[in-house]
């Protein structure tokens, strides 16, 4: 069975869609989650998916001083992500964006691991704008968002099957 890496985080909006995909993906892939030590770690607990932590930092917009060490931390996070991908035996990466996804996607590209990303918002986030060119496809929740990317494909939003049943 191939190994699919799930990544994305910084907010629940980047993690919950990945959680919705787990039951279907688990049937065809070994799943591993790579994220930060933040909300995604808490949300993934008890889901039966191995978790690897990457110590990444969020860009603080408008503050040069708070970002001065960021390039060094970022390089370290790419290195950590590369090690986690190699240890997991990654065959493909599925990203939901957010600052956590950036080092994971860049590490995947260094390892020549294919990447898909999903943009849930009508207006693409910064991380997905940066990684879009490095992805096989940018999957989107909205048709108009797909048009913003050369490799955009409208797929709709991943949701839990319980919502379809009204549970």
Language-model segments: residues:
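An aromatic- and histidine-rich active-site surface loop
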Residues: 38-42, 92-111
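Active-site-proximal region of nucleotide-activated glycan assembly enzymes
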Residues: 30, 50, 109-166
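An amphipathic, basic-hydrophobic alpha-helix
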Residues: 63-92, 102, 110
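Conserved acidic residues
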Residues: 2, 89-91, 136
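Residue-level detector of alpha-helix initiation sites
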Residues: 11-12, 16, 98-100, 122, ...
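Conserved nucleotide-sugar phosphate-binding/catalytic loop shared by glycosyltransferases and other
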Residues: 3-9, 29-73, 153
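Short amphipathic alpha-helix
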Residues: 14-25, 39
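Structural motif
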Residues: 7, 34, 95-96, 118-119
């Amino acid at each position: 069975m191939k190994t699919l890496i799930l990544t994305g985080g910084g907010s629940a909006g980047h993690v919950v869609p990945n959680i919705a995909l787990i039951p279907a993906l688990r049937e065809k892939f070994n799943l591993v989650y790579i994220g930060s030590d933040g909300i995604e770690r808490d949300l993934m607990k008890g889901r039966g998916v191995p978790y690897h932590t990457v110590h990444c930092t969020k860009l603080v917009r408008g503050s040069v001083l708070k970002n001065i060490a960021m390039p060094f931390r970022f390089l370290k996070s790419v290195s950590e992500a590369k090690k986690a991908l190699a240890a997991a035996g990654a065959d493909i990466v599925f990203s939901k964006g957010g600052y956590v996804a950036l080092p994971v996607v860049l590490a995947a590209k260094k390892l020549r691991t294919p990447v898909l990303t999903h943009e849930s918002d009508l207006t693409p986030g910064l991380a997905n704008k940066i990684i879009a060119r490095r992805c096989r496809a940018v999957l989107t929740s909205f048709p108009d968002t797909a048009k913003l990317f050369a490799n955009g494909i409208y797929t709709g939003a991943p949701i839990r099957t319980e919502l379809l049943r009204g549970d």
